[in-house]
A protein has these predicted regions:
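Pocket-edge structural micro-motifs
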Residues: 33, 49, 72
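Short beta-strand-centered aromatic/proline hotspots
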Residues: 27-36
Length: 73
């Protein structure tokens, strides 16, 4: 069995501390870290809403597909 590579923050388009704008909603978010989804080991971002302070997790592929715009890092 081949061991899958765990998420490496250097592999992500957005680095921890980056501030993002969601294109569709206009919401602002801060990236906290790059993690792995337990069931699949798929890389995922953990990020926080800068308005509500809610925490979110989104697969790396979705996060980097153009729905978020980098505003600062």
């Amino acid at each position: 069995m081949t061991k899958r590579k765990m998420a490496d923050p250097d592999d992500g388009l957005f680095k921890p501390g980056s501030k993002l704008k969601h294109i569709k909603t206009g919401g602002f978010y801060q990236v906290l870290l790059l993690a792995n989804i337990e069931a699949t080991l798929e890389p995922a971002y953990v990020y926080e809403s800068m308005q509500s302070n809610d925490f979110w997790i989104r697969p790396k592929t979705e996060m980097e597909d153009g729905r978020f715009e980098l505003i600062s890092f």
